[in-house]
From Swiss-Prot:
This is Glutamate 5-kinase. Pathway: Amino-acid biosynthesis; L-proline biosynthesis; L-glutamate 5-semialdehyde from L-glutamate: step 1/2. It is found in: Cytoplasm. NCBIfam families: proB. HAMAP family: ProB. It comes from Geobacter metallireducens (strain ATCC 53774 / DSM 7210 / GS-15). The keyword Transmembrane helix does not apply. One of its GO terms (cellular component) is cytosol. It catalyses: L-glutamate + ATP = L-glutamyl 5-phosphate + ADP.
Length: 373
């Protein structure tokens, strides 16, 4: 199965973890970058396109600025990123250039992908670079980013880039051999799982509670990235990037690392964008009847099923749809603002125009703009 899947892959997103790229965290691991360049050249010779999602800018800049340990403030981190980006790209340019490959830097914030026009423009730029044989190196724009427009981590960014680039495979290079059934650093009997057919609640528990910021070898965010990529119909391959030749071994059919199969029912591009790229602005709370209809029948959300609205948002915003117990059941783009929904909630669709004096449609959220989670 693995060989058949990898044989069809033409466009790959490779996410490089900071521990792999910075080694002892005293700067960039130049030996790793040289190996990556050689293995990427081999993939290119096989007719595959490669996109790199890279950490390392802050670590590289921190050393240049003489900052010991992690930056103690956001301005320090952003200053380190500003100087580190050029150092990082110089390293990629030198090592990839030895194989005749050009690299290009793309810095993104969540806003760039949440805006549909900028999202499509970024996709066109990626396609053009790949058509010219250039290897894009993507990172979050740490120099200007604030909490409101952060991706959160580069694992999440790599999953969103997989959608953006319409890639066929996400590769996550980390510093452990793959996904284990428990923390291999705490449990010497932890078992490496080579194939994950579906990411279930049990899988998430093995990685650590999904609501926690820590997990099995940093596995929580990596598992979330694999799940997001899988919902777009893309498999994820998790490999130990500290092992020389690991990409070559994987694409030669060796059973290394962990392969996560994609979801059986994948989301289309727009719904994946709604579910994972847009930042929700508020919450729409629905009754049990609406919850059942949304979850099981894939219907639109009508005002009659809404019991209250939380937060302030305009028409066209993304919101969380939650049950009366507070559990999130869906996300969607609303056809009415929070103020309008407050006036029409609990009413039939036929009453909307009489209440508001106008009508955008029968639905609070049309099913084409609604993603059940």
């Amino acid at each position: 199965m693995r060989t058949a899947i990898l044989k069809k892959v033409k466009r790959i997103v490779i996410k490089i973890g900071s521990r792999v790229l910075t080694g002892d965290e005293n700067g960039l691991n130049h030996a790793f970058i040289a190996r990556l360049a050689a293995e990427t050249a081999s993939l290119r010779q096989q007719g595959r396109q490669v996109i790199v999602v890279s950490s390392g800018a802050v670590a590289a800049g921190r050393r240049e600025l003489g900052i010991e340990g992690r930056p103690k403030s956001i301005p320090q981190k952003q200053a380190a990123a500003a100087i580190g980006q050029s150092r990082l790209m110089r390293a990629y340019e030198e090592d990839f250039g030895r194989f005749g490959h050009k690299v290009a830097q793309i810095l993104l914030t969540r806003d760039d992908l949440a805006n549909r026009r900028r999202f499509l423009n970024a996709r066109a730029t990626l396609d053009t670079l790949l058509d010219f044989g250039v290897i894009p190196v993507i990172n979050e724009n740490d120099t200007v980013v604030v909490d409101e427009i952060k991706f959160g981590d580069n694992d999440n960014l790599s999953a969103l880039v997989t959608n953006l680039a319409e890639a066929h495979l996400l590769v996550i290079l980390t510093d452990i051999d793959g996904f284990y059934d428990s923390d291999p650093r705490a449990n010497p009997d932890a078992r490496l799982i080579h194939l994950v057919k579906s990411i279930t609640r049990e899988t998430e528990r093995a990685a650590g509670d999904s609501g926690s910021s820590v997990g099995t070898g940093g596995m929580v965010t990596k598992l979330a990235a694999a799940k997001k990529a899988g919902q777009f119909g893309v498999p994820t391959l998790m490999l130990n990037g500290t092992v020389p030749g690991i990409l070559t071994k994987a694409f030669a059919g060796r059973e290394v690392g962990t392969l996560f199969l994609p979801a059986r029912e994948s989301l289309n591009r727009r719904k994946h964008w709604i579910a994972h790229t847009l930042r929700p602005s508020g919450r729409v709370i629905v009754d049990d009847g609406a919850r059942t209809v949304l979850s099981r029948q894939g219907k639109s959300l009508l005002p009659s099923g809404v019991i209250r609205v939380e937060g302030e948002f305009d028409r066209g915003a993304c919101v969380r749809v939650c049950g009366a117990d507070g559990a999130e059941i869906a996300r969607g783009v609303v056809d009415y603002s929070h103020a309008e929904i407050e006036r029409i909630l609990g009413h039939r669709s036929g009453e909307i125009e009489a209440i508001l004096g106008y009508k955008y449609g029968d639905e609070i959220i049309h099913r084409d703009n609604l993603v059940v989670l």
